């Protein structure tokens, strides 16, 4: 597929593409983290270029402008790629349809796997070849052990984003750089950018889904949502919900039903349009079923191996 790539800040773009020195393409959002990643790589004498994805939503154009501005300040080329069609198909549509199936989507993980390290990676190679590393401002690490490269947690436990990166192809990991992996706080990152004099240093951190705020994403999934019963494990109806898309497994708050003891969502049954709740003791499970498994270190999988699983980004 041919991608529409714009040289938004064409400074030294020809020289970068033909540079014999070690090169890195920084996927930039125009925020503090990706700008800090670029600064750190410049200190390591990488020849840099920036690339930003352009998608049709309210924040996309400002991200491109901000990233382009940062690249101009750094004196490096910047490219933008319009991937609206792919983003809608690979991230937004699955996000919306998951709720109607009683599932809780993870759009950030989908975006990392299918867009940043998928579509954007392919667009970069189509334009620039493959003799460069790809860097982002994620708080995670790539470690090398016995000639193999592995995805690892970032040093900052609260900011660690390895959970959202676990879908990346193992074949791509050797070419990936996470310069912020050893940073232990957001203030440390912001301090680096501030000391460099970049105007982006005071840009606020975004905590929302990039393509919709809380109200917006509720509106996106409300079209096929219908009221239905909330019941307990005995079948007793305790109340009503406004649509199964507003609930997720393990949820306790916002159920809208009165009870002497805390109740948790333990099951969502789409075909019955039903939400099932139970006590904390009943909410635990001894078995889980994993889907879309991506094995990054198959050599460690051995019979009898004891493993830990992680079901949300801030879980253990």
What does each model-identified segment do?
Residues 1-167, 185-188, 192-194, 265:
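ATP-dependent adenylation/nucleotidyltransferase module used to activate substrates
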